[in-house]
Every structure is written in structure tokens, then in C-alpha cells.
Amino acid sequence: MTEISEICETAFKLTYHPIYRGSLFIHLFVSISSIIPLIYFVIFKLPKTSFHGNLKFLFSAYFVSVFLFSVDFAIISTTEILIPLFSKHPCNLLIPDQYLKIGNTTVSIFMSLSTFFPISITIERFIAMKMARTYEKTRVRLGPILTGCNILLDLLIVFFIYRDEKFDDGSISFVFFPKTLAPKMFTFFWVMFFLNLINFTFNSYLLRQSIRLKVSTSSLATKYQREEVVHSTKFAVFVVFCHVILFGFYVIGIMILRYFGSIFIPDPADLMATRGAFTTMISLYNLVVGSVAVYLNHLIKTRKSEEITGTVRIQATGAVGAQNYENAIFNIWNSV
């Protein structure tokens, strides 16, 4: 009974701690705000891009996974805000085991799923660079296959991590990992972070190679195809970079607070509240990724339009303009 009372007392202190309580409202606001740019980009912007269907499919799946992550977090934060309003006893603040298992598992699935897609996008970009001359004519198969592999692999990993977990520690949040589960999940996140870091390096190499191949191409048709690969790869590189920075910040921050937090925050209650608040701030990643995608798409589209305008514009005045006019008339007569 003493242990149960201590758990309930700790739950009460953490639930009503101003740092943690305030973070839930911020978390809810950020989660809802992140949904808007994600929906806007996936529905209104991504379909209009000149990206190959495989890349569009992968980006759609990636941003949809981030969108589902935001929705899940919005539901979770709303629930955690409302629970104290209807709790009459400190122990009522603890989430029942069966609900905690479902909520915590979905958080892990959506959080980890988005970390697989940048690697798949790099695989698709590598194949696109190698097959630049014929890739535009290939059917949309690679994107769905890679997406299916991502989902299956993520589900299998989460299943093996969670299969022996009983969820009997008690928790006030769906986001907190149980003591026996936390080391496994953080190891998984570290592995994914380093894989994404390597992936970003390779993606940057692909971009440089694509630019080099475009410059060395003499054929106008081939140059245009290479240009499309360069633009889409640029977009992919910036999205992957954003993903690596934000995900890395989250993982490193969690580990610092977990193992060295007591050095900076000596009070146990304040440290626990700060760790809880930082854990919920992963929703900021969703907002930034969606907003950056919209901005980058607009920027690349604008620069591409300027490049095309500069390429096709011919001088229409003076001696050069007269020569251009004469050449145009000559070409028309030759085509008759």
C-alpha cells in the first residue's frame, strides 16, 4: 500500500506541476497547428509538383505519418488535460494499464515510422539519378513498395520491443515509456538517429552528383530531365536535413535530461516535470517539418520559374534582336 501511495503522490505532484501542466497546453496548441500545413502541403501542393510518382508517393506517406502523429498527440494531450478535471483521488490520475498500452504503443509507432521514410527517399533518389534518362517513364511501383517495407519493418520492431511489457508501473502520460521499456526505445531512437545522419550525408552526395551530371549534359532534353532530378533531390535533402536536426535534438535532449538532468535541476519534482515537458515537445517537430515543406516547395518553384524564364528569353531589340528575328523566320520557311 505504501508503494501505491507513493506512486499516486508522485503522479499528483507531477500532474499539477506548473511546468508540466503548462507544457500540455502548449503541446496541444502546437499539435493542432501542425495539422494545418501538413494537410495543405499533401492535398494542395505535393500533387502539383513535377516530382516523379514514386517520390510523390513516398513524400505523401511520410507527411501522412507525421500528420497521424500530430493527431495522435493532439488526442493524447487533450485527454491528459481533461483527466485531472474528473479525478477525485490522486490514484485516479494514473492511466489504466489497457489504455496506457494502446496509447503508448501508437505513440511509438507514429514517432518511429517517420524516421524510416528519409532513408527510403534516399534510395528512390539514388535510383532516379542512375536512371535519369528513362526514370520519368518508369511506372509508380518503387514508392509503394518502399512505403510498405517501412510500415512492416516499423511494426515488427515495435512489436518485438513491446511484446513482454506489462505496463504495470503506472503513468499519468501516454508519452512516458515504462522503466523496463525506456532503454530499448532510446536505443532504437539512437540507432535511427545515426542511420538518418548517415542517410543525410549520402543524400547530400547524391545532390552534388546530380548537379555535376546536369552541368556535364549537352542534350537539352537530357538536361531538362537532370534538372527535374536536381530540383526534387534538393527538396528531399532539405526535408531530410530538417528531420535529422529536429529528431536529433529530441533524442539528445531526452538523454541529457535522463542521465545528467540532476546536475542542472537538483529538485526531483522539477526535474521530472522538465523531462515530461521536454518529452511532449516532440510535437514541435511536426509543425516545423510541415511548414518547412510548404516554404521549400514555394522557393524551389519560384527559382525554377525564374530559371525557365531566363533560359527561354531572347533579345528582341537592336542588332541581336534583328538576327534572332531573321533566324526565326528562316526556321519557319525551312519547316514549310
UniProtKB/Swiss-Prot annotation:
Name of one Pfam family that matches: 7TM_GPCR_Srb
Gene Ontology BP term (one): sensory perception of chemical stimulus
Alphabetized UniProt keyword annotations: Membrane, Transmembrane, Transmembrane helix
Membrane topology, as annotated: Multi-pass membrane protein
Molecular function GO labels: transmembrane signaling receptor activity
DNA-binding is among the record's keywords: no
GO cellular component, one term: membrane
Annotated transmembrane regions: 24-44, 57-77, 109-129, 142-162, 186-206, 237-257, 276-296
Locations listed in the record: Membrane
Signal peptide start and end residues: none
Family the entry assigns: Belongs to the nematode receptor-like protein srb family.
Protein name: Serpentine receptor class beta-15
Species this protein is from: Caenorhabditis elegans
